[in-house]
Each structure stands twice: as C-alpha cells, then as structure tokens.
Amino acid sequence: GFVALLKKLPLILKHLP
C-alpha cells in the first residue's frame, strides 16, 4: 500500500547520514 511506503520513508531517512 501507499501508506506503508510513507511509513517507510522516515525509516529510510534515519539510515541516511
């Protein structure tokens, strides 16, 4: 779902330096 993607975005941002 699209909502799941939005929830994953913050997690990806945290992985970035």
From Swiss-Prot:
A GO CC term assigned to this protein in UniProt: membrane
Intrachain disulfide bonds:
none
Main location as per UniProt: secreted
Biological process according to GO: defense response to fungus; defense response to Gram-negative bacterium; defense response to Gram-positive bacterium; killing of cells of another organism
Q: Does the keyword Secreted apply?
A: yes
For the modification Proline amide, which residues carry it? P17
Purpose of the protein? Antimicrobial and mast cell degranulating peptide which probably acts by forming pores in membranes. Active against Gram-negative bacterium E.coli NBRC 14237 (MIC=3.12 uM), against Gram-positive bacteria S.aureus NBRC 12732 (MIC=3.12 uM) and M.luteus NBRC 12708 (MIC=6.25 uM) as well as against yeast S.cerevisiae NBRC 10217 (MIC=25 uM). Has hemolytic activity (at 100 uM). In the context of inflammation and cancer tests, is weakly cytotoxic to normal cells, induces calcium signaling but does not impact cAMP production.
Protein name (database record): Antimicrobial peptide Xac-2
